[in-house]
Amino acid sequence: METFNHIDIKKYTREDLLYLRNTNNVLFKMFQKQVDEIACLSSKEQKLCGTLTSINNIINENYTIYCLIHTDGLIGFIKIGEKNLYLYDKIKLHYGKCTCVLDFYILEKFQKRGLGIKIFNFMLKDNDISAFCLCYDNPSYKLQNFLKKYFSPCVLIKQPNHFVIFSNYFKNVSIKKVYERISN
């Protein structure tokens, strides 16, 4: 098994990307191209027609992207952001602003080397949040297995909106973030 030294994790917010675009457009375009390439692979893995991630999407929607960077360039990312979602807990319908994992992909050559959990834990720590408090946008089979492997025991609950939550999501999310509404 090949070891990969010199792997960094970098966080880019909307403000970071706007600053990069305004101060070093050449570097911005190169980064944009790398994100687009990995986003295409992520979409292909999920059997989607279009891509979920682009620099413009991150800027326009005020999302955050965490990037795994190797000496050769970008090798993977996690995109997170807040979304207003309706979620069911089998009894009640909840509505609120939820922190979501919107896209997660690592180049195949770099998978199964502990880099996924490394970037995932970095993102969790940076946001002071638990994996059980996140919503996952239409996670691929690989992402579901990743969650089961590292956050076991877990039961993932599919929502009608294609998001997935952990079965104990409502026990972990503060009432300030999710408001209850009686479902009819």
Swiss-Prot record:
Q: Which reaction does it catalyse?
A: L-lysyl-[alpha-tubulin] + acetyl-CoA = N(6)-acetyl-L-lysyl-[alpha-tubulin] + CoA + H(+)
What Gene3D superfamilies has UniProt attached to this entry? 3.40.630.30
The cross-references to Pfam families, in alphabetical order and at most eight, read: Acetyltransf_16
Gene Ontology terms describing biological process:
regulation of microtubule cytoskeleton organization
- Keywords of this entry: Acyltransferase, Transferase
Which cellular components does GO assign to this protein?
A: microtubule
For molecular function, the Gene Ontology terms on record are: tubulin N-acetyltransferase activity
InterPro entries assigned to the protein according to its UniProt record, in alphabetical order = Acyl_CoA_acyltransferase (IPR016181), Atat (IPR038746), GNAT_ATAT (IPR007965)
- Site, Crucial for catalytic activity: residue positions: Q46
Top-level taxon in the UniProt lineage: Eukaryota
Q: EC class of this enzyme?
A: transferase
* EC number of the protein: 2.3.1.108
Name the residues that bind acetyl-CoA.
104-117, 140-149
Q: Where is the N-acetyltransferase domain?
A: 1-170
**Recorded family membership:** Belongs to the acetyltransferase ATAT1 family.
What is the role of the protein in this entry? Specifically acetylates 'Lys-40' in alpha-tubulin on the lumenal side of microtubules. Promotes microtubule destabilization and accelerates microtubule dynamics; this activity may be independent of acetylation activity. Acetylates alpha-tubulin with a slow enzymatic rate, due to a catalytic site that is not optimized for acetyl transfer. Enters the microtubule through each end and diffuses quickly throughout the lumen of microtubules.
This chain's protein is named: Alpha-tubulin N-acetyltransferase
Q: Which organism is it from?
A: Plasmodium falciparum (isolate 3D7)
